[in-house]
Each structure stands twice: as C-alpha cells, then as structure tokens.
Amino acid sequence: MISIRNLCVELGDFTLKNASLEVSDGEYMVVVGPSGAGKTVLLESIAGLYPLRQGEIWLRGKEATQLRPEYRQVTIVYQDHALFPHLSVRENIVFGLRMRKTDPNQTRAALERVVDLFGISSLLHRRPATLSGGERQKVALARALCVSPDVLLLDEPLSSLDPQTREDIQEELQRLHRMLRVTTLHVTHNFEEAVALGERIAVIGEGEVKQVGPPEEIFRRPNSEFVARFAMSRNIFPGVLCRPEAGNCRF
C-alpha cells in the first residue's frame, strides 16, 4: 500500500536520510522516535507537502512521487487538529468534499456515515472553540475519513490530550481500525502508545529509520543501543573491553 524508497528530504539544517518503509494494505503502523527525529517530515512527505531531494513514494502500487497532494488519496490529522475556527463542525467535516465539488447527495451520505461512526450528531452546529480536546479530535478524524482516503496519516494524535481522554481516543482508534481497515501511519514520541496501537513499529532517530518490526521484536531484539534505550530496555550495562579473544570478547 505504501512504499517509501530511499527518501531524502532537506529542510534547513535537518535531513531525512535514505528512509525506506513498507506499509501493507490495511496495516496500522506506528512511527516512534524522539522530538526532532523526522517523524512529521516523513508523514508530510508522504502527503506530498515537501519536495524530495531523492527517493520514491508509491501508493497502491503506483508511483506518487510527483503527484500533487490533492491527487494522492491521503489525509492527515495533526496534533492541534487544524480545524477551521470560523466554520461549524458540519462545515469542517465536509470541507474536503466541497473542495472536490462532490455531488451534494454523496456529501450528505458521507457526512451521515462519519457522524454515526463517531457519535457526534449533537456537535454539528457548534464551533471548534466550544469543543473539548476529545471532541475536537473526533471531528478531525471524521473530517479525514469523510473523503474515504486510501491512507490515513496521524501526527501525534494523542499527545495534547489529558490521560483519560487519551485512553478514550486510543480505544476509538483501535475500534475504527477494526471496522474500516484503512491503511494507517501514526507517529508518536511515546513508545508505550506505539506498542498499544501498532501492528508493527518503525523506530526513527536523527533522520534515519533505525528498525522496523512487531512491537515484541523491537522490545526484545533491538538492533542498536539507540533502539534499546528508546524501547526502555533494562539490560543495557556499562562495560570495558579488556581483551578480544578468538570467537569471543572478555569484558
């Protein structure tokens, strides 16, 4: 579904270096790493928001490297929700369909579908400023799914929420994925969140994809000290190499 091949993006002093990643159709993958690692740059590159220095992006078996964002069938939900403050919830949700000049009957049907999905019919006439953090997140997700995207990109969707709301939205994301099986790439700095949601995890740091695998593999068999420390492994100990010997080393 998503194939990223040797992606390089330069933004000022930051470079996303030779990033390669494969996300299967219907998979929920979480990209995890510290702040400034390149997680959001990776998402926005897939969405077509940055020019690439090198590399290719393939979506649904077709090269999308040069496609404009509006032709990629990809939607992105940001940490701050990016809702239009002057529009009602209803107008926010159908904004993408109206920009595409979708038939009014189809727009109405799509609106009803996502409103029922999230249980937000009582919010339709309200403005974003009057909503709670959890309600804004549901509206942002409803807007993203209203256009029936092939790929859903989530940029730190839980990080600005209080603990109870974070747990509720996490359960909502799991429920939605079970129902819809939309290919999803979710970025976070929280390893526990990545383990809870990801069918596979990609660890990224310093602009590089360090390791990709199921959560248990990342935790039990990290391929570097960076991954081990980020996965909160407790079996890292300081040591001094005393003398290398044939077939082994003495510490």
Describe every region a protein language model picked out.
Residues 32-34:
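The feature captures the beta-strand-to-loop junction immediately N-terminal to the Walker
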Residues 40-43, 139:
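ABC ATPase nucleotide-binding domain helices that frame the ATP-binding cleft
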Residues 53-56, 206:
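Conserved coupling/switch loops of ABC nucleotide-binding domains, chiefly the family-specific signature
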Residues 73, 86-226:
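ABC ATPase nucleotide-binding domains
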Residues 55-63:
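Conserved ABC transporter NBD signature motif
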